[in-house]
């Protein structure tokens, strides 16, 4: 029994480490894999693959090839753990060939594996760096193998370092850091929204104790598409609608990615295409398969079938998304019929990122675009801009005889009516919810009372408006 333990405890320790590593990344850090898969593009074409045939690029070729399979559940953690474990086993065998004692060789192996795993806590750390480390550990193992059999040839075997360097280059090394579980939550809501799991987005946000702007952006985006943005706008403060975003040199990558989702939901294909292009620019190697899909979609919806086909042909050369491209060609009109009805067909020139003007254009084209309506009204309310809220409410609700009797809007109208000393007829015209009117009277007798934290009146009096 002791002989058995001495013989196999090393591999048992490495196997247990590998299981723990896989479990951690699969169950506590899975969305990092989806994020990396979506932020690259790998094509099965000779022209594309030939772009990797340069010094130091072979690790990138293998890494990007394997990363595309992160699309599939469980596969990302399996690939990453397998690569790290192989590197660890090679290091262990190499040091054993150099006659290092088993416990020390095992300690070195586990230390390397742990360090590489920690590097993967960073989203910017690519699988190609781990592939590069594997190549160097393989070279070390080959040199050690020669050393164990013929020490005189060891120096000659060291010549393997040159081709290894030319093929794989040097790996990127990250500083020691903790897992970023806040960023993982950001990726979670982003990916679940992308996958169409809107209920899960709401569940993640509402069950979290802390909320980032990314989480609240997608929470509001889901609620808007369900027609429930006014009911949930003030559930978490400060909140984030995305309508005040500006693209510039200091704009975070996640913010740039979010903008195309906002414009797509609103129905503006020109701004969707622009935002998708910007995301491509700031992605890994300026390639982003998720944005390729979005560019195909927005051009298809806007009627530019030639441009859409250009992106669909690119996706035809991917392993994962070629079926998606075929489905768009076959059923695109049915899939995007409702989106086509929202599109602004007028020729307009828009300068800058003025989301308010953009939403006005969309509503002038289609007054039934409730997503744009709620976003334009809620945006002005977040800024406490009651005058412009009233103007937009009249233009798109009152004047069209389609009052949107949401509690939030009724509460905001109470503020405008009270502030302008409106006559009774105006109150009767705008305030059609008697429960809101009664509560407004109660609030006026105890302004700022936390018992009214769920009202717009409390927000208007007590909460700081976002800086624009």
Where are these regions (language model features)?
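Membrane-interface micro-motifs in multi-pass membrane enzymes
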Residues: 37, 52-56, 104-147
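Soluble catalytic regions of membrane-associated enzymes that act on cell-envelope
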Residues: 178-344, 348, 365, 369-383
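Start-transfer (signal-anchor) and selected internal transmembrane alpha helices
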Residues: 1-20
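Membrane-interface coil-to-helix junctions
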Residues: 22, 26-66, 70-75
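Transmembrane-helix motifs of polytopic, lipid-linked glycan transferases
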Residues: 81-99, 113-116, 137-144
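Internal/C-terminal transmembrane anchor helices
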Residues: 154-177
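Terminal, low-structured helical/coil segments at or just beyond the last alpha-helical repeat
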Residues: 362, 421-468
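Membrane-helix interface and helix-disruption motif detector
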Residues: 65-78, 98, 120-132, 151, ...
